[in-house]
Amino acid sequence: MKQAKFIAIVLLSFIILILFFSCKDEQPEIPDFHADALQIQEEYRPGFAVRKLKHLLIYTYGLCGEYDVDYEIVKAVVGVESHWNTRSLSSANCKGLMQISKDAASDLQSSQADLYNPYVNLTLGVMYLSWLQEKYNGNQKKVLKAYHDGPGRVDRAGILNYRKDTYVNKVLQLAARN
């Protein structure tokens, strides 16, 4: 009986050791926020403080982790939508970094006045992308098409030709570049 317990303890200890050493403690690679901020400044916002861009990027990275949205995709959406201009206003009356419409803001229970606040805008945009990811089962092209054209249009269109969709392709190319 004692020998059986001893063997069981040794085997259990051995299994635990194998599991311990076989599991790699993989940490996600954290982006170089300073390099990203410099790149954004050079491409889109000359004269905009790198420190502020860096802070926005760190905030964005945290949001992406919280809502399980790809950080590079969000950076690309912001680049395509507003060129990182916090005061951007489209002809369709979409506002801020992620070009949030008043309808999307009200759907996400935020006032339209907040849309020029970059932190509110990023939060709403990432939340919206997260919701679209869930709605379209992670189909990134459909998610981006719906972000740009609205989910109603995507749902009515059925099969979409993404090869000809310049918005979707721009965002994906920009995200892949980083």
List the predicted regions and their residue ranges.
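N-terminal Sec-pathway targeting helices
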Residues: 1-12
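Export/targeting segments at the very N-terminus of extracytoplasmic proteins
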Residues: 24-84
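Catalytic and substrate-binding regions of cell-wall glycan-acting enzymes that process beta-1,4-linked
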Residues: 29-36, 104-107, 138-178
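Short glycine/serine- and small hydrophobic-enriched flexible loop segments
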Residues: 62, 79, 102, 106, ...
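Surface-exposed patches in mature extracellular/periplasmic domains of secreted proteins
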Residues: 72-76, 88, 137-146
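Substrate-binding/active-site groove segments that recognize
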Residues: 91-110, 125, 171
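A short, structured beta-strand-centered segment in the mid-to-C-terminal lobe
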Residues: 113-121
